Amino acid sequence: MPDPRTQIVADAYDAMGETFAAWREGFVGDPRREWEDDLVSRLEDGARVLDLGCGGGSPETRRLAQRFAVTGVDISPRQVERARVAIPEAEFVCADFTELELPRSSFEAVASFVVFNHVPRELLVPLLGRIHGWLVPGGWLLSAFGASDNPGWTGEWLGAETFFAGFPPEVNSRLVREAEFTIERDEVVVYESPDGPERFQWVLAQA
């Protein structure tokens, strides 16, 4: 059974998936494309890429699916349905990725675009360890972490109750290294959303 906090996230994105897609159209200075391009430049065509928290078929997932064998995972059934329609060439799985079990060395890259801020703190450490195991030696992790010291918050966002948590940047960096990754890039980036400034820590690391 999913953690009650991650189930809150599933229910939230079931309820406000289309609202969220429209909301993110208002981003100014969004770094996703630049970081994704960096990841793509390090992969061969046809590489196996796992997209954690893929949502309803984001532009990032769509671009990855143009060159790679993409498996998207999302906890929201409605978002997964939307993704399957939007990007039929990719494979999508509805699951709580904090509980996901996959064979070792299954992917050349794992990407997670501004999703780990929904992961309860105590679940992030084992998740990073499993991600390392899912990657082939030399595989890549691209992720954006929440960049604030947030033990856990549940409340309304975009019209639905959801959950957020996170560590400060220095802790995120340490946890990535402790999961036996070598960090290639590590930057805190601020961009504008319709709600105001957003601050996330972007990390590109090699297994």
Residue positions per predicted region:
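Class I SAM-dependent methyltransferase SAM/SAH-binding core
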Residues: 50-99
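Conserved class I S-adenosyl-L-methionine
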Residues: 1-45, 149
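Short, glycine-/aromatic-enriched active-site segment of Class I SAM-dependent methyltransferases
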Residues: 146-163
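Conserved beta-strand signature within the Rossmann-like core of class I S-adenosyl-L-methionine
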Residues: 138-145
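A short glycine-rich, Lys/Arg-flanked "PGG" loop and its adjoining helix->strand segment in the class I
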Residues: 125-137
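Short alpha-helix
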Residues: 164-180
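Core SAM-dependent methyltransferase catalytic element
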Residues: 192-207
